[in-house]
């Protein structure tokens, strides 16, 4: 079976597209014929070796996939079932989706919800699923469309594109943040009410800035998140799910104790299955298939390795889906 394989010898990492035998797959109670995988920021870090994402070598990357069950000893799945996998350390500690077959734990799988097909579910992928977890976090904390604008950082990326689309479809006014002025038309096409230059959120952080937004979804961390927090309206809510700008957070407690705001952490990797099912049900019902197509690029399997560095220099738009099985 064809696979992307990351290997390490001493301190040198190498990545190749190679052929593997099925008996090399790790343990698991479900064997899946992978139809589609995707390329995410974490996959790019793994493939390029720019961060210690991979915990075991050799490793097949790919933090998500969609496909059809080939064999199963798990009570919830049988051959022929169509399934989705996101997270659970797949592509980091357990071989992932950038291979024609994957053997995983059935507890990690989610049944494909109607009316999505396998390609659409992959187009949504971990980025879209994470975006929905963020939207659900805002809703859970009482943020409604009438409260004011919702700011979304990294809006032209995978999480940001889906978040912008989902929020706009529900009637929220979205302020889309991007470092690429050329993406303004794309973002407005997804439903953004306004487009903000990222530089507005990368400057010096004040304990309290001007009250601008009722809520936010942040993929960046660092000064971007800190500035976002300082500019929330009274009882605003920010859902944080990424660290593209850095793991630090140079903020103060002022927005929390003077404006009563909430910072909601969103983890898509170890998220409980009940929350996953809820997120995927909403994605199946709320996300416009036409908008999903608009934000997605299909990439040949053979180009995965050479494309990964583009994530790290910020030139990737939206989602990248990879047909795995020829």
Curated annotation (Swiss-Prot):
First-tier enzyme category under EC: oxidoreductase
Residues involved in NADP(+) binding: 41, 156-159, 178-180, 198, 243, 257, 268
Any single Gene Ontology cellular-component annotation: cytoplasm
Catalytic activity: propanoyl-CoA + NADP(+) = acryloyl-CoA + NADPH + H(+)
Phenotypic effect of disruption: Increased sensitivity to acrylate on plates, decreased ability to degrade acrylate. No effect during photoheterotropic (anaerobic/light) growth on succinate, no growth on 3-hydroxypropionate under the same conditions. Loss of 3-hydroxypropanoate and acrylate-dependent oxidation of NADPH.
Expression induction: Moderately induced by acrylate and dimethylsulfoniopropionate (DMSP), as well as by 3-hydroxypropanoate. Part of the acuR-acuI-dddL operon.
SUPFAM superfamilies according to UniProt: GroES-like (SSF50129), NAD(P)-binding Rossmann-fold domains (SSF51735)
UniProt xrefs under Pfam families: ADH_N (PF08240), ADH_zinc_N (PF00107)
UniProt keyword NAD, yes or no: no
The keyword Iron-sulfur is annotated on this UniProt entry: no
EC number of this enzyme: 1.3.1.84
Predominant localisation class: cytoplasm
GO molecular function: acryloyl-CoA reductase (NADPH) activity
Subcellular location per the Swiss-Prot or TrEMBL entry: Cytoplasm
Keywords, alphabetical: Cytoplasm, NADP, Oxidoreductase
Subunit structure: Homodimer.
Comment field (misc): The zinc-binding residues of the alcohol dehydrogenase family are not conserved.
Similarity section: Belongs to the zinc-containing alcohol dehydrogenase family. Acrylyl-CoA reductase subfamily.
Function, in words: Catalyzes the NADPH-dependent reduction of acrylyl-CoA to propanoyl-CoA. Is essential for growth with 3-hydroxypropanoate as a sole carbon source. Restores acrylate resistance when expressed in the E.coli strain K12 acuI deletion.
UniProt name for this protein: Acrylyl-CoA reductase AcuI
Lineage: Bacteria, Pseudomonadati, Pseudomonadota, Alphaproteobacteria, Rhodobacterales
